Amino acid sequence: MSEINTANVGKETQVGAFLVRGGALDVDYCYDDEKKELEILTEIPLIISNKKPEKETGTDIIMNRNQEYHITLENVNLTDETHRGGVRIRNGKAVITLRGINFIRGGINLTNAESAQLEITKESGGFTHVCGIGGTYKEIVINGGNIKAVGGAYAAGIGGGLREGAGNITINGGTLEAIGTGWGNSNGIGCGQWGSGGTITINGGHVRAFGGSTGGSNPPLPKVCGIGGDNVHILVNGGVVEGYGNNGGSDFGGIFRTAPDGNARVTGSIEDTLDKENWNGIINDEVMGRVILGEDTYIDRLTVAKDAELLIPGGMILVNYGTLVNYGKITVWDNPGIPSKSCICNKGEIRNSGVIDGWNENGSVQTV
């Protein structure tokens, strides 16, 4: 990648309904008033906003060249009128930061080239409503942000369109709600209607995904998943992950796995249980394998399976409002050098037929 010149960042130019900060018009970006397209030309970082955020525009943002793009969408309000995507990445990799409140109706679409990639940065903040993230060829990485992605007709909220697979989707963080909707059935995250294949990896964040259905029955519509789809490989390593299927589909459909050191909290029915003995995480309120809490956790019900272990490290608390059932081992563990204590704060009932152990005098079970 060539060195990025940031000398012009901060300048503001109006192009159509947008304000662009950074770069120079007709050098780093250009505007076609007839086509209503803002095309990004170089790697220089750009900040794009609506001049009037309360008023939506029909102008699309497009990236055609095989290079790395760096753009920030800040209070963008656009509606795609071409049905090809409000933000279109034809070639290259787009690194996008989301700020403020963004509405992208028509979605973020990766089209026509296997080289097209999308990365949403962990610096993203505010709230973004996107009508679908995906396309024909997809390499999608979401590192942060507060994003709601709603699929169009036959399309997943994040992933494929009609007869398309999921592509390669990685979620590392953020708060994400994905809904498959539009005319016909589609998965929340995964394949579009009648699509097959792809991979979904979830390493962190709070993810909620809903399979959608809004009508049509000839031919009969397929079952849809919250996350996955036909022959989709799902690897859940961390975060809080909820799936909600539709039309008789599982909440998680496809080939389901966890990492050997996974600590995700997963909620939803899982179609594929062939690897269940190797699952590691809190899955449907049951601790499986060896799980180290990565954040304060609040439960109404939790069971630690036989031969499973739940470790609560220094600075973390487990708050029980309902029933905690332990058949395995719970370790309350204070790390040297971390001043805050770890504990189980019990506001309900603990049923223990296993071991609850503290690694030193600070580890505690506190009943409130």
What role is predicted for each listed range?
Residues 1-368:
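A composition-driven surface/loop motif
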